[in-house]
Every structure is written in C-alpha cells, then in structure tokens.
A protein has these predicted regions:
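Flexible, low-complexity junctional segments that flank or bridge functional domains
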Residues: 22-321, 325-333, 393, 408, ...
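Bacterial N-terminal signal peptides that target proteins for export
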Residues: 1-8
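Short, conserved helix/loop micro-motifs enriched in His/Cys and acidic residues
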Residues: 382-397
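Extended, charge-rich low-complexity interaction segments
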Residues: 309, 339-354, 450-473
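Acidic-histidine catalytic/liganding microenvironments
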Residues: 2, 272, 416
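Extended C-terminal subregions enriched in glycine
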Residues: 393-415, 420-429
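A substrate-binding/cap region within the structured catalytic cores of diverse enzymes
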Residues: 292-376, 384
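N-terminal signal peptide c-region/cleavage motif recognized by signal peptidases
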Residues: 17-19
Length: 492
C-alpha cells in the first residue's frame, strides 16, 4: 500500500514497495477518469433505467467527464489526483458512487493553513463553532459568516466545497464539509484560506482579517470535532444514561466487534425491554458495507424478536439488474465464495439458491439480448401476531452520518410501535444499491457503485429521514452533554 504525504507546495511522492520515484499524475488522472466513465457507462444500471434517477446519471456521465478532464492539467500530486476523482464521482449526486484512494489519504482532520477557528452548518447558514483557546481577533462562537473577500458565504461554499469535499445539495453534505470552509486543505482546484471575512453578530456586521495559525494536529482534530459529531474509538457499546440504556451503534462496518456487542445486547435484553425505554444512537453509522443492513437488523431482532420485526420490514418489491457480462461475473464470483464456505452452505442455503437464480437470469437475459431484467425481492413475512416484547418508548438518534445500510435499518425501525426518530437529518442514498468495487488503472483509486436498481423502494431516491417537529435537535451536535440532556427530555 502506498502512502502519499501532502505538503503546502507541489511535492513528490513517497514511494513504498518499489514504485517509481516520480509519476505523471496528469496522465494517471486522465486515464482513471476515462476508465471510471467507461465502467459506469457499460455496467451501471442508471445508464439504461428510465426516470429521474437515470436522467441525473446520464446528464453528468459525459458532461462531467469532459469537465473533469479539462481540469486534469492541474493534477500534480496524489492529493490533487484524489480531489479530481472525488469531483467526478460526486457530480453524479449519488452517494453510492465513489472514487476513493487506495492509500492513506488526507483524512478529515487535515489542513495546511487555517485561521484558528472553524464553522458549522446550522439553520441554513455557516456559523463559528470552535475558536482555538487564546486566539485573539477571531469572531465569537455563534457569529454567522456573511462573505469573504466580497464573495458570499454560499458562493464560497459552492466553489470550494461542493463536489470537492462533498455534495452540498444534501443537508448531510453541508454539515460534514462545513469545517473546511475557511481552511486550506491543499486542494489546488479551489481557493485556499481567505484573508478578510465578514461575520454577523445579531444585527451587527464586522469584517475580520484571518491570519494563518500554526498547524497542530490535535488542534485541527479538536476544531473539526467541535463542529461535527464524530464517533470515538468505541463505536459499539451500551451505557446507562439518565437511568435508561443507551445503545451506541456509531458504525456498521464489518470489522467492528459485533460478536462482543451482540453478546452485550443479549445479556441485557430484559432490561432493554423494560418500561423505562432506551435509546438507539445511530449517529455516524456510515453503512457502505454490504453487511451493514444485516448488522442493524440483527440488533433489532435481538431486542425485539425476528417474529415481531420481520412482518414490519418494508416490502422489497422488485430489483432491476443490468444485463452485462461484468455484472454477471460479479454474481458468479459471489456464488463461488458462498459455495466454498461450509458454514455459509449450512446456514444460508436459501441465499445460495437465490444467487444461483440471479446468475441463471443473467444468462437468459444476455442470450436474449436484453439490457435489463427484473427479479422479485424478498417476500414480505406473514404477521404471526407475535406480541411486542418491548414495553417502553424508544428513541432512535440519527444525524447526517447515518448513510447507506443505516437508512435501510431506519426503514424497519420507524415501522415499529413506540419508536420515535430524533436528532438531525440523515444522509441520503440512491436507488442504485449493493456496491461493487473496481480498481482503476493507476492503482491509486477504487471506483465503487451500486450495481442493481431498487426501482420499487418505498423510500425515494436520495430521500433522507428528517425528525419530526419537536424531535429535531438544533444545538451544537458536538456538545455531547447537551445532546444527552436533550434526549432525556424526550422521555418526559
């Protein structure tokens, strides 16, 4: 694996495992952009699915490639290569399409210049959320950014953050990228740190000169965490807060300690089901893993029962597949891995049978020259009349970090009795689901995209969950004490 080290100026590549000492990143960028475009054009279902989601994909596929290729001459390092790849992928406005570095990239806690404070997105505006201790001449916390160097805060955000750092057409994209608005993150395609910015405090506006402050990794991390809720080192745990269980599920990743966590849940299930109620905290539960939905369903089945939750899962409807040899091969390879695992064969014979049926459907569609074919999804389970074992109220706490499989879990949790959704607006995902990953020619990036279309999904394309009135948290999401105190009031 290669680690590319950033610096303030154009710099060379640190080479690991015998790679060449210098690379023409401009050529690599053009090559990777074209390869990503061709892979999506030839295999992504959105290319041939009618409707708004397909139209959005097709409008960017070629136009976005041309736009990104026009910027490739500015690529001069691994960092700028990664930024341009992200720009093209984010332009599809589909959270299930991504181009990520295969090496350790910049990460969220990185800047080469910053003014000693940072902003957060709140109430449709950018406001100061964190100021370095002892910093003089900075706008006070809560000040609203009006403009910088004569450019409005919105126009600055669009030029500097949108597509480069995230999707500003979504609330979650606004929240997660807001700390970077006044930082220089070594993106040569966008402006760096502005010199003069105007902030509003109440009705009064004042211009401040932003001065570069020393870069300290701990300060940069604290500044980001002071503006955006960021899960800690232990994503899975059960605590007791205000006299009731608080179930932390801040990750749905495969490498989290699910065995230990599920053991905790099972040992405390009688308490969880008691009249006092409990909290399921899904903030930051990024769910890009193929198993993310199953992990969340596994938690629900342990707290309630499979007999109670299964009839309340959303109806799957039909799934549309694009009939291409590459997409068929993905299922062939998946089926082979399933059949080679004795435990999976023993425990999941129905999944193997279903996957084999999909491969057969690919063969039939390809032989007939069809572009697509549809398969029925999981049938809705019959309601056996099983009683609800959970006596008390349940609050499910979410934020913009709840994405992908986390949203699938909400599709089911929000259908259970006495469950309320609280917090802030979640992330979004498209109807193009189940990621496939392709290594791009440079070896420095992977393209991932959803390779089948859930055209009948009850939750619409790119539709987030938004807590109802009275259940939306409007304070600083990074103030954990305030968040927990507020959640406690929801049980009163």
């Amino acid at each position: 694996m290669l680690r590319l080290i950033s610096a303030a100026s154009t710099l060379a590549l640190t080479v690991v495992a015998g790679a060449a000492q210098a690379q023409d990143f401009r050529t690599l960028a053009r090559q990777d952009l074209q390869a990503a475009h061709d892979q999506l054009r030839d295999n992504h279902p959105a290319a041939v699915i009618p409707g708004a989601a397909g139209d959005r994909f097709r409008s960017w596929l070629d136009a976005g490639l041309a736009e990104a290729q026009g910027k490739a001459g500015q690529v001069q390092s691994g960092d700028t290569h990664a930024y341009l790849m992200r720009y093209y992928a984010n332009g599809f406005r589909d959270g299930n399409i991504a181009i990520r570095p295969t090496y350790e990239g910049l990460g969220p806690f990185f800047a080469i210049a910053w003014p000693g404070f940072t902003t957060r997105w709140s109430g449709n505006q950018y406001e100061v959320a964190y100021v370095r201790q002892g910093l003089r001449g900075a706008p006070p916390i809560g000040s609203v950014l009006v403009s910088c160097n004569g450019v409005s805060a919105e126009d600055l955000a669009r030029s500097k953050l949108d597509l480069w750092e995230g999707d500003l057409n979504t609330e979650s994209g606004r929240v997660r990228t807001a700390p970077y608005l006044l930082w220089n993150r070594n993106n040569t395609f966008a402006t760096g740190m502005p010199q003069f910015c105007t902030f509003r405090q109440g009705r009064r506006e004042r211009e401040y000169e932003l001065k570069i402050q020393p870069i300290d990794a701990a300060q940069i991390e604290a500044a980001y965490r002071g503006a955006v809720y960021t899960p800690g080192a232990t994503p899975l745990a059960i605590e007791t807060i205000n006299g009731r269980p608080w179930i932390n599920v801040h990750s749905l990743a495969d490498n989290a300690d699910w065995a230990g966590f599920f053991g905790q849940v099972e040992s405390q299930v009688q308490t969880l089901r008691g009249p006092q109620g409990f909290v399921i905290d899904l903030r930051g539960a990024e769910g890009s893993s193929m198993n993310a939905t199953a992990r969340g369903y596994g938690l629900a089945n342990r707290i309630w029962t499979p007999e109670f939750t299964a009839p309340r899962q959303p109806e799957a409807g039909t799934i549309t597949y694009r009939a291409t040899p590459a997409n068929r091969q993905w299922f062939v390879d998946t089926l082979a891995r399933m059949q080679a695992d004795p435990r999976f064969v023993q425990e999941s014979a129905s999944v193997i049978e279903q996957t084999a049926a999909i491969v057969a459907a690919f063969d039939a569609a390809l032989a007939a020259g069809q572009q697509t074919f549809a398969m029925p999804g999981r049938p809705l389970a019959e309601d056996t009349g099983a009683a609800n074992p959970v006596q008390g109220p349940v609050v499910v706490l979410v934020d913009g970090g709840c994405t992908g499989g986390c949203l699938d879990v909400l599709d089911m949790l929000t259908r259970l009795p006495n469950v309320r959704l609280a917090g802030s607006t979640t992330g979004v995902d498209s109807i193009f689901i189940e990621p496939t990953v392709v290594r791009l020619p440079s070896n420095y990036a992977d393209l991932s995209y959803g390779h089948k279309a859930w055209t009948t999904r009850q939750r619409g394309d790119n539709q987030p969950y938004q807590p109802a009135q009275g259940l939306a948290y409007t304070g600083n999401p990074a103030d954990e004490t305030a968040v927990r105190t507020w959640v406690g009031t929801l049980f009163q």
